[in-house]
């Protein structure tokens, strides 16, 4: 009896486990695109010929970079300064309607970027990938952009009705020379989240943080401020009166401490007058004091009315066609490395992917970078020392030449004196 009960218990546990696994499988995220730039990556990506005829198209290198956490973990890196870059990959077309969309990738600016982009684009429809460039329409643009001191931010741009809409929030990007993971999550409730290195940096409503739709309400264009509306917050104090004789107070008065010089001659110098000084009693033009207006009604504002041009879009977050991912940018200084692309509908899956790629190597990469910087500083210090030695050698050589010239001049002078003596 006990054995039968135990068998029933095992069976129930097995069923429960099976149901749990089925539940996990049912909610498991879907991966629409993933790229770690391993073997065969070139067959999945198309290098654009955009700007090639102008000799302004930059080349991509397949590399792990100058410093890394794993030399076998490679991405693609811009390799030429002052060049345009464009490359794209196609994946099975889908729409994020009624589902979450996650776009994630890592980027490293090894060149200490001072002007250039590090963003990616999602595109729909049919794209001629060989002609993919700056004028190619896109659905989403996301990622860091740096240029000088004024631009150091994460771009998040949505294209709706053939118009690019920029996020109204300022989201700072990373500016060091290490790899960082940028994640954009778009939820079907029209909210979004931006993360850097799996840490949330910005979130909110797409309705509020982008001007995609016209406002729901507008000021009534027909409304006029009533003529008797009192919008003066302060008024002159009727009890405040100007003192008698106030206007007669002079701005300057003769200096009472001034004395006529003893050698002053009225006939020759004219009548002496004391110099003037600012009058301490003079307070400037009289101004009536002001008091709060008891009838103040506040600043008049036109009443708000429903905007006749507003039309709600419950799918403001959605894009009907997402079919390509592309990198299109201009770089003054090359060296930006892209890796670990992921498009999915599961934020947790994206978080795990980031930890298993970037997170796994970030400490080793930081150590490699620190070692490279240390070596660079030592080489620069050694070169500076060599330059100082060269300068010292040049100075010593100049001194020797000067001494030789002085000795030569002295000898010539002696010979000349001897000749003159002989002549005498």
Curated annotation (Swiss-Prot):
Biased composition (Acidic residues): 386-401
Region called 3 X approximate repeats, residue ranges: 270-308
Signal peptide: 1-29
Basic and acidic residues bias spans: 217-262, 356-385, 402-424
Disordered as annotated region, ranges: 217-289, 356-424
Matching InterPro entries: Calret/calnex, Calret/calnex_CS, Calreticulin, Calreticulin/calnexin_P_dom_sf, ConA-like_dom_sf
A Pfam family it matches: Calreticulin
Disulfide bonds: 115-147
Sites where the protein binds an alpha-D-glucoside: 119, 121, 138, 145, 328
Keywords per UniProt: Calcium, Chaperone, Disulfide bond, Endoplasmic reticulum, Glycoprotein, Lectin, Metal-binding, Phosphoprotein, Repeat, Signal, Zinc
Top-level taxonomic group: Eukaryota
Family matches, as SUPFAM superfamilies: Concanavalin A-like lectins/glucanases, P-domain of calnexin/calreticulin
Localization, UniProt: Endoplasmic reticulum lumen
Post-translational modification: Phosphorylated.
GO molecular function terms listed in the Swiss-Prot or TrEMBL record: calcium ion binding; carbohydrate binding; unfolded protein binding
Entry note about domains: Can be divided into a N-terminal globular domain, a proline-rich P-domain forming an elongated arm-like structure and a C-terminal acidic domain. The P-domain binds one molecule of calcium with high affinity, whereas the acidic C-domain binds multiple calcium ions with low affinity. The interaction with glycans occurs through a binding site in the globular lectin domain.
Free-text function comment from the UniProt entry: Molecular calcium-binding chaperone promoting folding, oligomeric assembly and quality control in the ER via the calreticulin/calnexin cycle. This lectin may interact transiently with almost all of the monoglucosylated glycoproteins that are synthesized in the ER.
Name the UniProt record assigns to this protein: Calreticulin
Taxonomic source organism: Oryza sativa subsp. japonica
Upper classification of the organism: Eukaryota, Viridiplantae, Streptophyta, Embryophyta, Tracheophyta
Gene name tied to this protein: CRO1
């Amino acid at each position: 009896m006990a054995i039968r009960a135990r068998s029933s218990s095992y069976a129930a546990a097995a069923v429960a486990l099976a149901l749990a696994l089925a539940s996990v499988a049912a909610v498991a995220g879907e991966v629409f695109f993933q790229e770690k730039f391993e073997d065969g990556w070139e067959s999945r990506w198309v290098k654009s010929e955009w700007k090639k005829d102008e000799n302004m198209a930059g080349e991509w290198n397949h590399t792990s970079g100058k410093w890394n956490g794993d030399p076998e973990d490679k991405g693609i890196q811009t390799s030429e300064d002052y060049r345009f870059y464009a490359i794209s990959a196609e994946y099975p077309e889908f729409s994020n309607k009624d589902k979450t969309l996650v776009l994630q990738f890592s980027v490293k600016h090894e060149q200490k970027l001072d002007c250039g982009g590090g963003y990616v684009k999602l595109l729909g429809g049919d794209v001629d990938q060989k002609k993919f460039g700056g004028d190619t329409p896109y659905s989403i643009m996301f990622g860091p952009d740096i240029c000088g001191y004024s631009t150091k931010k994460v771009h998040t741009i949505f294209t709706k009705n053939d118009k690019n809409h920029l996020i109204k929030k300022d989201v700072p990007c990373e500016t060091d020379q290490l790899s960082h993971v940028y994640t954009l999550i778009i939820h079907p409730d029209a909210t979004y989240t931006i993360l850097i290195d799996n840490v949330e940096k910005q979130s909110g409503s797409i309705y509020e943080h982008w001007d995609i739709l016209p406002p729901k309400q507008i000021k009534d264009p027909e409304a006029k401020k009533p003529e008797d509306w009192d919008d003066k917050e302060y008024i002159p104090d009727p009890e405040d009166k100007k003192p008698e004789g106030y206007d007669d107070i002079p701005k300057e008065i003769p200096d009472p401490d001034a004395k006529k010089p003893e050698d002053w001659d009225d006939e020759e110098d004219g009548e002496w007058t004391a110099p003037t000084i600012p009058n301490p009693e003079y307070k400037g033009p009289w101004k009536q004091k002001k008091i709060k207006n008891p009838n103040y009604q506040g600043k008049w504002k036109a009443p708000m009315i429903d905007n006749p041009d507003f039309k709600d879009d419950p799918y403001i977050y959605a894009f009907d066609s997402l079919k390509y991912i592309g990198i299109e940018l201009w770089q003054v200084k090359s060296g930006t490395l892209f890796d670990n692309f992921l498009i999915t509908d599961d934020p947790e899956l994206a978080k795990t992917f980031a930890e298993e790629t970037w997170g796994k190597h970030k400490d080793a990469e930081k150590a490699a970078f620190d070692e490279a910087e240390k070596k660079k500083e030592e080489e620069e210090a050694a070169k500076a020392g060599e330059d100082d030695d060269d300068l010292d050698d040049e100075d010593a050589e100049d001194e020797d030449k000067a001494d030789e010239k002085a000795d030569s001049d002295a000898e010539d002078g002696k010979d000349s004196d001897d000749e003159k003596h002989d002549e005498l």
